[in-house]
């Protein structure tokens, strides 16, 4: 990952978006930005959760539960917010926490499906990504920033 320092002599290679690993990293990062934008625009108190179901071409099909109404006005505001986040090139920070701490975080953020899933996780550490005050878990690498 690009935020890590090289500690010994080695060969560094870059993974472009045209390769599968690069595309997946880009997509995860874009989803993270989308989720943050939705919660920023609609308000955390108005969104219970967002579920990304699958992709259709270059688009994502998702559902949103809560009192916020998913309409064209909200979509337009989310798009503007995503562009603001991208333009600011905000670091996407990764931290390793205990699985128990991750479970507590998921509960605090009303991510009950992840909370339940992680109760069965055997690994003691989990990587949590944060974008300003927004946190989530993703399986795989992320871009170093929103730009």
Which functions belong to the PLM regions below?
Residues 1-3:
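Short acidic beta-strand-loop surface patches of small beta-rich interaction domains
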Residues 7-12:
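Loop/turn positions that initiate beta-strands
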Residues 13-18, 58-69:
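Short, hydrophobic beta-strand segments
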Residues 14-43:
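N-terminal catalytic cores of NTP/NDP-binding nucleotidyl/phosphoryl-transfer enzymes
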Residues 32, 62, 140:
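Divalent metal-coordination and catalytic microenvironments
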Residues 40-46, 87-88:
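Secondary-structure transition/capping motifs at alpha-helix termini
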Residues 44-57, 72:
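Short, flexible active-site-proximal loops enriched in glycine and acidic residues
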Residues 56, 65-147:
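Non-catalytic interaction/regulatory segments
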